[in-house]
């Protein structure tokens, strides 16, 4: 049977068919120059200051290094998300060397590829200008921003590589389905299915939104596009088969090296946490989602929605009342918006920047609802349906990702991934969707468009200043060779600890850091013999304190580096929570404090580290957390 030739790709961006005619002010070369230039500037500015010294990121680096040296994930070393990211990183490190710089190189490549992918996806539903502005916001506010003092929440040294890899694969799957709606290419269907299979090997909070988004897209294609409807069986096979087969094949492969139950839990990844009632009720996750202060967070969402409405409504009315040929009045609007942006950039410390993302769930829901309504009308032909289907998938992804912080949406922290799709939709709305609606009514779309760009520039200026404030704290060089980076002042104590270990502890002695901080293992070149290398509440809740303690008793590390502010006779401490009472008691009973390294009491990033040596059954002579 002769195959149908692929349909020629539409030259005009689909948004033109959906929202009305808009001018394209940027030449074809501008996006690459602007986005590429901004990325290079941000990289140069933040270079070497991406990771946090002790928290989160080093867990992924240490795990990948251990896998590269032959240990087996889940069997020899505990891990609580899917196997894709650890093994991808381990393969790369096995080839290019087990160092921080090698992993940074991989992440730079992923970031470059993702920028291309994000731009192409946004061009499926938006103009060149809107896609370019969106990518600029992404680079400066998410990918390379430094919005909290610790670092971690960026695409180069992320707190969790599973978040980045899963998100990239999710956007890739949506883009593949977008291309399928245009060309009915079987390769694009297979590409979507393969990426859906891989994304399930990352994290539940990423894989579930991606699956929901793609499922909604497939349903919309089948219901609204006669071409796809006639091919629905083959489409379902090509998408669903690899999405189901890849996790199954990985499970069977892992089962060759460990018990089946262990392999199954490994493939489930963080789904184990999703259904764990103890983890789900932890204060950190309730606070992240906004459930700790329900009425207060709802009030903040409404307040910020009202603020944004108050900011955007006057220029919207002004643009509607201004004809497109009244350039003078349009210029006045743009100048006023520019003035507002300058005021925002200068007075940002009085705007509670941590709350600026609060209305994002509302934005994603409204755009999604309007997209469903437009699809139900079934107007505009194939290009319009294709664009609306892509917009629907992006809207579902945006709203679903925000579920982890639904009442506490933010650009920082988890928001460096979870808030990206909703923010991209908001930018498209300001630069394309609303101006297109204005143009259809004869108003000055260009004036509102450039006014929106000015306001967005003001928001970006706020976050650049936040990044500058946080980056200014990082002035202490840490590490040697391929593991060098620049840390905050805690690096002075870490350098002292690493130096002490090199001088006083034989190189074959094992080391654990309590409760977290495997970067010290990396910097000192020492292995943690324990199965669980991160003694934080979620890990202990999943494995059970009894099991973790039993493993420590069987293979006690020769030396501990302990955060003295987070251990005492009552247990380990995390924020206001006290946990792991028996583990803390065992440490105090079997380890002796031999050295301590402390920041001055008045230091803003104060840390107190102690080195403890294993003494068998001999109890520690002092409470290590007591003042020296």
Segments (PLM) and residue ranges:
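Transmembrane-helix motifs of polytopic, lipid-linked glycan transferases
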Residues: 105-134, 139-144, 172-175, 317-318
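Extracytoplasmic catalytic/substrate-binding loops of multi-pass membrane glycan-assembly enzymes
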Residues: 48-63, 72-91, 98-102, 258-260, ...
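Short hydrophobic alpha-helices at membrane interfaces in multi-pass membrane enzymes
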Residues: 176-198, 227-241, 330-339, 389-398
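Short periplasmic/luminal acceptor-recognition loop of GT-C membrane glycosyltransferases, typified by
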Residues: 80, 470-479, 483-539, 548-569, ...
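Membrane-interface alpha helices of multi-pass inner-membrane proteins
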Residues: 187-204, 210-218, 244-245, 250-251, ...
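Hydrophobic/aromatic-rich transmembrane helices and adjacent perimembrane loops
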Residues: 208, 354-370, 383, 388-392, ...
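Start-transfer (signal-anchor) and selected internal transmembrane alpha helices
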Residues: 1-44, 235
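Membrane-interface transmembrane helices that cradle and orient dolichyl/undecaprenyl
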Residues: 165-191, 221-229, 300, 304-319, ...
